[in-house]
């Protein structure tokens, strides 16, 4: 146990160790976003497919699967934030006065990584409260008749109407607006973050740099377009209403 503790302490106290933590957790979160987007886009297939998908997620491992994954997600996000803040503090402490001018050369995305990251973290908390915990203005999602007893083929009892919950949630303009702004910040964060992951893993070279930058930007735009298509379709074009 002491050996494990010593190893973990050595990783955390090392700049390289913290960079690896940021890269590994970042890669996990990047892959999660792709999977989460694919699942979210099922909403366009209608109530039955989306509610069947939601029912499957909430009944994996007899209901424990979704919560185990959420705990892993929270741990990954927490480590990602803590390691990034620690690295930022170390870099600022070690920076010489004349090096401050170098930030002018940096991209907007790289200079706003901390701000965009913390805003995204705040959005994550709000998103969980809204669609998972269903607290505050979303409390009715657990009690109103329209969200209860949706009938699925092969399921004896009625299930929660997650599709209707999404439609009603994004029908509120300020919820959709906050969601779109958060996705814009996420896109900015990803465009620099994905490149940093490649660099930390030693996969970025002069020859591959342009391609990695292109892939990072393309992935960020794909994620942004996919996620915001849902509130825009509902709020602007009246999908599902």
Which residues are covered by each model-predicted region?
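Membrane-embedded alpha-helical bundles that constitute the cytochrome b-like, heme-associated redox core
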Residues: 1-241
């Amino acid at each position: 146990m002491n050996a494990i503790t010593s190893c973990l302490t050595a990783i955390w106290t090392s700049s390289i160790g913290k960079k690896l933590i940021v890269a590994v957790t970042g890669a996990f979160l990047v892959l999660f976003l792709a999977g989460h987007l694919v699942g979210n886009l099922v909403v366009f297939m209608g109530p039955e497919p989306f509610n069947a998908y939601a029912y499957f997620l909430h009944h994996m491992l007899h209901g424990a699967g979704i919560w185990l994954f959420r705990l892993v997600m929270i741990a990954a996000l927490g480590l990602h934030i803590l390691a990034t803040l620690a690295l930022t503090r170390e870099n600022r402490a070690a920076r010489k006065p004349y090096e401050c001018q170098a930030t002018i050369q940096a991209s907007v995305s790289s200079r706003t990584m901390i701000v965009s990251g913390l805003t995204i973290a705040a959005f994550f908390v709000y998103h969980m409260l809204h669609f998972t915990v269903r607290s505050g203005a979303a409390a009715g999602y657990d009690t109103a008749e329209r969200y209860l007893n949706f009938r699925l083929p092969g399921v004896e009892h009625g299930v929660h109407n997650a599709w209707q919950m999404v439609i009603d949630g994004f029908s509120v303009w300020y919820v959709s607006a906050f969601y779109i702004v958060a996705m814009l910040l996420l896109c900015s964060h990803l465009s620099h973050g994905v490149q940093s992951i490649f660099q930390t893993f030693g996969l970025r070279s002069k020859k591959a740099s342009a391609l990695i930058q292109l892939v990072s930007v393309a992935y960020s735009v794909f994620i942004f377009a996919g996620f915001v298509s849902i509130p825009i379709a509902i709020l602007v074009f009246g999908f599902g209403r």
